[in-house]
């Protein structure tokens, strides 16, 4: 664990625009709900009625998986999550609508702090991409070091709202959340990024430390 933290800190030093290397105890919870198609409207209604102030966004899957609702929640700490009365009340009401649910507890990489999703950003970006990577055991820190070598170049084209790694749930998991104006906008931006030699080299280095990758396109939902 100490070696992992040392590698994360090294990735911070490599990323020249980062000034604050302190890591807070704040965590993010990525919730994935599998809902029967005819239950989705009722689930959205219930989610809207019980929306907590720490909810950062809700999406429904379009490609990659079907009938999934994705929710991102912020917790000042895991202890706050444990004491959150909303969590208990919502779960008891929603249980009959949910086939399966998963919860992934995430922390943000210090060089990619989460960017709040404003109404304007949500309205402008109709298509979002949730990218999930599984790093090889013991290679997450090295992945972070390699990724930061090209992240500044990639941000010149477009930025994710967050880059996270898992604390609880499947370990060695990396999560990116990218906003796009449309599907064509996504193709255009990714094609442009792959013409940048720095980013191409970064992709080659980072993929060497990964076991798997998954992409879901998700559509924002207004509750």
Curated annotation (Swiss-Prot):
Gene: nipsnap
Name the record gives this protein: Protein NipSnap homolog
Lineage, uppermost ranks: Eukaryota, Amoebozoa, Evosea, Eumycetozoa, Dictyostelia
Single GO cellular component term: mitochondrion
Family indicated by similarity: Belongs to the NipSnap family.
One BP annotation, GO: mitophagy
One Pfam match: NIPSNAP
